[in-house]
Amino acid sequence: MRILLDNFSKSFGSTKVIENMQLEVGNGEMLALLGPSGCGKSTTLFAVCGIHRPTGGRILFGDRDVTDLPSQARNVGVVFQSYALYPHMTVAENIGFPLKVKGMPTADIRKEVDRIAGLVQIGNLMERRPAQLSGGQQQRVALARALIRKPDVLLLDEPLANLDAKLRLEMRSEIRRIQRETGITAILVTHDQVEAMSMCDRIAIMKEGEIVQIATPAEMYNDPKTAFVAGFLGNPPITFLRGVLDKGAFTIPESEIRMPLPDTVAVAEGTKLMLGVRPEHFTPAGDIAVPGKVTFAETQGRENLYDVLLSGGPLLRSIQPVRNDIHVGDDVFWAIDSRGVFVFDENGRRL
């Protein structure tokens, strides 16, 4: 089921939250709305769900205009951050409740419950109550309840926020598997870049009620259009160096950093610039050598993370395979890989 938000706007009183948004989610696609708190991603999801009525524009499911339809008439499945399971009901009763409300015969409900329980792999938990379940098991029950009505659209609002790191990893892959097996169109709302990049076909990054870029995870990471997007994706995050164009090279005044810029960056001498350098692009193997001193070193299992204070003051972060010969206080002569550097103007627009 294709979803289209056509010039979608939403205000609360005199406060405009979203204005003239244009967004299309393809049939069978899983799309993430990613951004900081307050950017409008949940407001967008609630409008698709039917909880919020748009102030302007249209919402279409396929060719069907659902803008003015209530939630119950839209055939959507929703999983919220709080799973909202009924504590007095068993797992089977929780999952089957939407069908019971619709008046489906008990035998048919049981058949559907068994089918969906097999899909989300909780067939052995049918007689337990929510208090007897782990966080991951409760999440699976909530997902099963959302899917049992065979919705056209699945909406996920921060569904993994209450899980620990191990369970989040497990449920990321499980939700993605289920979405692919069912072929359902899904929208995920999250502020977690790892969730968005690992679970979704495309990501729409939002800022202050606007979509600033929409692309596949790989395209978004490797070709950010703004410094905001570049800074939002990546862990450890990208480092921004501020300088000016001097004789064709990016230069940080009072430092030894000079980096020739590609011919595609056509700006005037003296223009203020920002250089974005990801940690994986500052290593001993780069092509623009810069001296510095290690101020922080951390082992992260398979990798080491370093903070290096460059001559002249700026700090660069480096991530490398584990090595034991670098310590805090050491002088290093590493290099920036110019092929992985992003150049932005002083306002954060990619050049």
Language-model segments: residues:
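Non-catalytic connector elements of ABC transporters
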Residues: 236-240, 247-351
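Conserved ABC transporter NBD signature motif
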Residues: 57-65
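The feature captures the beta-strand-to-loop junction immediately N-terminal to the Walker
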Residues: 34-36
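ABC ATPase nucleotide-binding domain
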Residues: 4, 24, 60, 244, ...
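ABC ATPase nucleotide-binding domains
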Residues: 30, 71-228
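Pre-Walker A (P-loop) beta-loop-beta motif of ABC nucleotide-binding domains
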Residues: 21-32
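Helix-to-loop junction immediately C-terminal to a conserved catalytic motif
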Residues: 49
